[in-house]
Amino acid sequence: MPDILTLYIAFWIFIIGLCIGSFLNVVILRGLSKESIVFPPSKCPKCQHALIWWHNIPLLSYILLRGKCYFCHEKISPQYFIVELLTGILFTGIFFKFGISISMLLMLIIFSLFIVMTVTDLKEKVIFDIHSILLVIFGLVLSLVNHNLQNSIIGILEGVLIMELFASIGYLFVKSRAFGVGDTFIAGGLGAIFGWYPLLFVLLLSLIVQAVITLPLYLKKLYKAKEFKTIISLALFLIITACYKLFTMNKDISMLIIYVGTILVVVSGLYCVRQVTRNIKSATDAIILPFGPAMFIAASIFIFLN
């Protein structure tokens, strides 16, 4: 159990995180609107009225104002509250994970970039080059601190090559890239942070996260279009794969069952892919969600659980 001093430091790390989160909101919104992050002073995005000092207190202002502008009474985006709270929580988690160290400081910066890039990607599907460059730079600095620079450089190249390969696969189905160029830069940045070997697990976890988010939306779309054959093929593939995994966990299982199970998984998977690709005739038919947030979620999970 943490001692009193550790909890005291954690409290102030959380407060600092809230304040940084408030600043990150400014970076996000003014970056998208191409305004200076310094001038003009904070204002309501609806009525443009300059805010009073107590309107800028992280979390508290949103609660006290009940999520509305003090002047025009229009609703304030919950993004302000969510980003501030998330930053505070992540900063505190990083403190408990790394302690007071150079690695902690670098991770605070890296996670700040994660948050900014996630929100801009979700809001406008935009990844600014400067943020990608900073991610690579601080990833390399972190690798220097951990005496692992060569591994980091290989990770950058690996991340870029893998994402470009995946992006090219999109041309086979929807005549366009499967992922944006920004996602390639993100993968390069994650390669700088993790190195080449852990990056493979992070990218695999990213695909799982993306699938978990996208699958319900895709199934809903198929249901509305009455594409029941595709829904059934997806369900069969998932059921067969789950049963195969359960059976192969038994060490006494015969090789015949393993071979038959493997064939069933492959056949059901190919049939599932065939049905899905038949329903995706163009990029507009596909459910396209930004992949950057999935990579950042996967990276965060890997960092905190590793």
What are the language-model segments listed below?
Residues 1-306:
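A membrane-topology feature that recognizes alpha-helical transmembrane segments
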